[in-house]
Amino acid sequence: MCIRDSLCGIEKYGFEGNVAGVDRSVRYDITLHAFMLSQSGIPVIYSGDEIGQVNDYSYKDDPDKAVDSRYLHRGEFNWSLAPNRNIADTVQGKLFHALDHLEHIRSSHSVFDTTADLRTIDTWDSSILAIVRENAEEKFIGIYNFSDQDKVAWINEDDGIYTDLISGHEMEAKGVMIPAFGCFWLCRKK
């Protein structure tokens, strides 16, 4: 999968009509946003990312902008796509609601505060990143699979049952099977 396309391949696969490719790309885009939102500080989401707005090539038609490819990502907000955010099976609906859900989770848990301790844990796979955020109330483990294959994160946080904040499912933080371009936000109270 080529990740150099707009929005992790959403643009490329959308124009090709490749539904499986679009679904994978949406999952990858959500995983990247989940990683960003699990970090300390103020997350910045560029205008249009929340609805899957693809690159705008019209800058090439303006002689004052044509030589500066940064305008590729600086097109006007595509308001015609915005209503699709309320349709669950569209790219816009999937991205908008996933980001909204992640933002709500982040604002509801103190473990995302800047005062939380942060460290990585080894997953024994270079395509999987696992981070731990911890404070006096909660322990969070973010697991991110940046591969196009299902993988096992060989972690062994043997300290109780965790809830995946994204899906609501309970699981142990040991040998976690993670789907291609997928992620888990595991959390438990102390």
Where in the sequence are the language-model features?
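A residue-level signal for conserved active-site and pocket-lining positions in enzyme catalytic cores
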Residues: 102, 141, 162, 181, ...
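C-terminal beta-strand-rich structural cap/linker in extracellular carbohydrate-active enzymes
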Residues: 172-190
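Generic "edge-of-domain/loop-turn" microfeature
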Residues: 84, 138, 148, 160, ...
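Short, polar loop/linker segments at the starts of domains and inter-domain junctions
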Residues: 61, 91, 170-178
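Beta-strand-rich binding/interaction modules
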Residues: 149-167
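A structural detector for beta-sheet-dominated domains
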Residues: 80, 156-158, 179, 187
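Loop/helix patches that line or flank the sugar-binding groove of alpha-linked glycan CAZymes
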Residues: 4-140, 146-154
